[in-house]
Amino acid sequence: MQQRIILHIDFDYFYAQCEEIRKPELKTSPIVVCMFSDRGGDSGAVATANYIARKYGVNSGLSIKFAKKRLKERTDSVFLPADFEFYSSISEKSMNIIKEFADVFEYVGRDEAYLDVSKKIEHDFKRASHISQQIKNKIREETKLTCSVGVSGNKLLSKIASNYKKPDGLTVVLPDRISQFIEDLEIRDIHGIGKKTEERLAEEGVKTISNLKDLDVFSLVQMFGRKSGTYIFNAVRGIDDEPVTPRAPTTQIGKIVTLKKDSDDYDFLEEALLQLCDNLNSVIIKENKAFKIVGIPVSYTHLRAHETLRYLVWRRMR
């Protein structure tokens, strides 16, 4: 079986970079793109920030209030409301460029995509490096956007590799360098291993990739269950056979509200939720849409977020 060659393309600090493209004079300033709430003032959270702002500890999910405190010494800091229509327009132009180079194109989100280029470059990693640079150059020329690209024989390694040399990076993981590449990573760098999993492993004295590779699959399944345990066992060995699947951008219709006050009163929250559903129902009926996934995202007092999703066989609101 011939070697697959998969690219993962990730646009660098996407929302903030779009704002730099719109206003180049802001490039030397900390830029913070915010999701402002209906409460006014500094109520809300950071959607993303450029690398200058990140040096001061400003990251996604931080409250705007705390972000401003951390950037207090930077009087040139800029806090901007998210403009998703503008970001989507740049994303669409960039994705259309990427599609030209792919045998199979998989859209992941506004700022990332997978490409299977195996046939186009005849399974040649040297040509994969060249085509990756061509993609980067064309996106920069036509949209002024920079991106980071990971190249490997599977989606998992390419995803990790695209994050390896950010921003504006290009990392190729050759088949005979997989073990060395993974050994140099932190456990948290493995896609799919979150903070809680890392903490659980640390409790067992597993603090490095090498430690983690010493655990057999049965131990990992016992700790995390069959699905997660097996995934971790394979991931730290660079094993992943998931195909690149053609996928177009999905349409999302949602209504978001910030309550006038924090509350744990069930009746009050139910009333607010039903009002949102009524508003959303009107939009769906007006646009004659069908849907298959319903989600309710919730942000708590300290900005910890949680989302519950339900998949439906088929449904249309009437």
Regions found by a protein language model. Give the residues of each.
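Long, highly charged, low-complexity intrinsically disordered interaction regions
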Residues: R127-D184
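Positively charged, low-complexity/disordered segments
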Residues: H306-R318
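Short Gly/Ser/Thr- and Asp/Glu-enriched loop/turn motifs at secondary-structure junctions
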Residues: V108-E112, S152-K155, K289-I293
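Catalytic palm subdomain of template-directed nucleic-acid polymerases
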Residues: L115-S132
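Short acidic, glycine/serine/threonine-rich loops at helix termini
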Residues: C18-E20, G44-A47, L157-K165, V244-P246
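Residues that scaffold, gate, or flank divalent-cation-dependent active/transport sites
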Residues: M1-R110, Y114
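DNA-contacting surface of Y-family translesion DNA polymerases
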Residues: D189, A202-R304, R310
